[in-house]
Amino acid sequence: MAGHSKWANIQHRKGRQDEKRGKVWTRIIREITVAARAGGADLGTNPRLRLAVERAKAANMPADRIKYNIDKASGTLEGVQYEEIRYEGYGIGGAAILVDTMTDNKVRTVAEVRHAFAKFGGNMGAEGSVAFQFKHCGQLIFAPGTNEDKVMEVALESGAEDVITDDDGAIEVLTAYPDFEAVKNALEAAGLKPEAADVTMRAENPIELTGDDAVRMQKLLDALEDLDDVQEIYHNAEIDAEAL
């Protein structure tokens, strides 16, 4: 199945994250904190914490720092209490945007998110205004040049829902949320390492943005990404690579 290109968008975000490793670590630590408090410190029984630890390792966070934050979150050490809040809104051309945050001060966070939307041409919506346009699922992205037939065979045999080849040759594997780890493990066991793998909110109906609209949309997304309390951003805009 063919699809739009996501490769340039992934590389753009990765480049920004590489420039701001300290902020990436902060986000991961918040995720570890919330995951451990919600499901306990045992990686074997807490898949959300397992995924957060994988992200930490991929970001080159030292093992002792990972352990420290798990211990702190699970009650061994005292720490900050975070609240998870999702904001919804519209970007350029009516593009749908979800903004997931973790915060110890929701008054500050909502003000910062609203300001970013307003400053860069978007607007915040009410709860439920755009969330229905996204599906909670597992997503794995493989670089252009990866053996498509092998990815498809292993992915579908291990329970993936779909395998999509994007316009630039990148391969996207989609799974139901509960099947994400099993599919990821099967692909990695077959020697197929994804460039990106995560549980995500995937847009059901993407819209294409080009030219000035694409540039403006990317500026809005970057502004939201730069907010300290923002963990993840999901949107349905297919942004022209020239705007990145």
UniProtKB/Swiss-Prot annotation:
One of its GO terms (molecular function) is DNA binding. The keyword NAD does not apply. SUPFAM superfamilies: YebC-like (SSF75625). GO terms for cellular component: cytosol. InterPro entries: Integrase-like_N, TACO1_YebC-like_2nd/3rd_dom, TACO1_YebC_N, Transcrip_reg_TACO1-like, Transcrip_reg_TACO1-like_dom3, YebC-like. Pfam families: TACO1_YebC_N, Transcrip_reg. One of its GO terms (biological process) is regulation of DNA-templated transcription. Keywords: Cytoplasm, DNA-binding, Transcription, Transcription regulation. It is found in: Cytoplasm. HAMAP family: Transcrip_reg_TACO1. Belongs to the TACO1 family. This is Probable transcriptional regulatory protein Rfer_2075.
